[in-house]
Amino acid sequence: MTFNPNIATHTLEAEGLRCPEPVMMVRKTIRTMLDGEVLLVTADDPSTTRDIPSFCRFMDHQLLGAQIDQLPYQYLIKKGLA
């Protein structure tokens, strides 16, 4: 799947934040979303390359794609069924 940020229904800019803040903000934002909606996260903390995929697995959300080749990193997360 090609990384396509245009499919996002919500966005979260977490640039400048450091662990654990980006994942905490992702969690807070996803809680306000409907099942199946897609969140685009933009971050520059290297720990997000590990923490966001782990968060998605643990919380049963789907990581649709990640762009981690250059800053800022971008992640597309589809909210799982509650």
From Swiss-Prot:
> Residues in the active site?
C19
Q: Protein name, please?
A: Sulfur carrier protein TusA
The similarity comment for this entry is:
Belongs to the sulfur carrier protein TusA family.
Q: Which Pfam families match?
A: TusA
Keyword set for this entry?
Cytoplasm
A GO CC annotation given for this chain: cytoplasm
Location in the cell: Cytoplasm
Note whether Cytoplasm occurs among the keywords: yes
**InterPro entries in the record:** Sulphur_carrier_TusA, TusA-like, TusA-like_sf
Q: Name one GO biological process term.
A: tRNA wobble position uridine thiolation
> HAMAP family recorded for this chain?
Thiourid_synth_A
Query: Molecular function terms in GO for this entry?
Result: sulfur carrier activity
Job description of the protein: Sulfur carrier protein which probably makes part of a sulfur-relay system.
Which cystines does this chain contain?
none
Keyword DNA repair belongs to the record = no
